[in-house]
């Protein structure tokens, strides 16, 4: 049917200029007009010249996020790096459901140790995670924070406590902080710091630049760890030119616009509060709290989630 055909595309919705894409996650307040102008001014050069290889691009990624070059690998979207990492991790992977499916989809099902929070809104704490996985011990543990799709958020100090538990138990911790810049503790809660990566050398931090920086068309993401052997493996596992020139140039110029980005994050949090209040006025939606750039809602009578999605598409061109 109509809606399923759109969903099979996974993007490319510029072909339908009347459509509003509320399916894929972006930042409406970044990149800033100044950054876009600089990209436009260099369009011809970037279109017609080769990008750099991994050495230069990992240097740029390290500069953007304040981590050592040998601790970070940039990818053609975080999805490219997730694929490599999921193939590399051995044994059981602890996953909290519902989750971003790209991680479990890259694993054999019987290698997953699944925790489903028994709460109405899928809320959970660091203690809940530690409690469950103390009894169902994985070799690696995935934490998406804020979580996707629930928007659940574990505060920074509790994430560090979870990292300490993993270190003591010999569990490798994978933290996906793709949405952390939308949280109320930003910018003080990132794990992309040399001292933290060195304190927890088995910890891996994933960040999709598409989501929070509003540039999904660039296909850009990073993975960081003080496990330099793992990072070196990931760098070799991707193709020689895994980033295009536009993605490289974005990293090259980003620090000039970092203040704009932080201002956009403040503006977004204000808009999220307003949007949640308005969304909560809709009688057939129960809106759950979120620290990300989306809300998980329970669809109530008279609609099912599918019926509502189809109606929004057919009557209002909203995906």
Predicted regions: what is each one?
Residues 123-134, 149-173, 177-212:
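Active-site pre-lysine segment of PLP-dependent enzymes
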Residues 87-143:
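PLP-dependent aminotransferase-like
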Residues 53, 202-281, 285-288:
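PLP-dependent aminotransferase class I/II
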Residues 50-51, 62-84:
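Short loop-beta-helix segment that forms the pyridoxal 5′-phosphate
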């Amino acid at each position: 049917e109509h809606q399923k055909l759109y969903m099979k595309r996974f993007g490319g919705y510029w072909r339908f200029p009347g459509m509003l894409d509320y399916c894929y996650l972006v930042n409406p307040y970044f990149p800033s007009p100044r950054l876009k102008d600089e990209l436009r001014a260099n369009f011809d050069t970037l279109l017609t010249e080769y990008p750099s290889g991994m050495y230069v691009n990992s240097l740029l990624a390290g500069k953007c996020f304040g981590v050592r070059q040998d601790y970070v690998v940039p990818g053609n979207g975080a999805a490219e790096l997730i694929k490599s990492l999921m193939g590399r991790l051995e044994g059981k992977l602890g996953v909290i459901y519902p989750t971003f499916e790209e991680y479990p989809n890259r694993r054999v099902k019987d290698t997953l140790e699944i925790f489903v929070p028994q709460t109405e809104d899928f809320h959970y704490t660091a203690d809940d995670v530690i409690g469950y996985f103390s009894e169902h011990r994985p070799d690696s543990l995935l934490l998406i924070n804020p979580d996707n799709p629930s928007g659940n958020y574990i505060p920074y100090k509790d994430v560090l406590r979870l990292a300490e538990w993993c270190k003591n138990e010999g569990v490798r911790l994978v933290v996906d902080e793709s949405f952390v810049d939308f949280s109320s503790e930003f910018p003080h809660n990132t794990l992309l710091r040399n001292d933290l990566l060195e304190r927890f050398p088995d910890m891996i931090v994933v960040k999709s630049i598409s989501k929070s920086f509003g540039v999904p068309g660039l296909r850009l993401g990073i993975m960081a760890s003080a496990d330099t052997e793992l990072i070196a493996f990931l760098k070799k596992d991707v193709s020689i030119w895994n980033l295009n020139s536009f993605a490289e140039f974005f990293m090259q110029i980003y620090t000039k616009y970092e203040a704009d980005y932080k201002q956009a994050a403040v503006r977004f949090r204000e808009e999220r509060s307003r949007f949640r209040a308005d969304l909560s006025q809709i009688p057939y939606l129960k809106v759950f709290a979120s620290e990300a750039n989306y809300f998980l809602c329970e669809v109530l009578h008279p609609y099912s989630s599918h019926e509502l999605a189809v109606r929004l598409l057919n009557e209002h061109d909203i995906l």
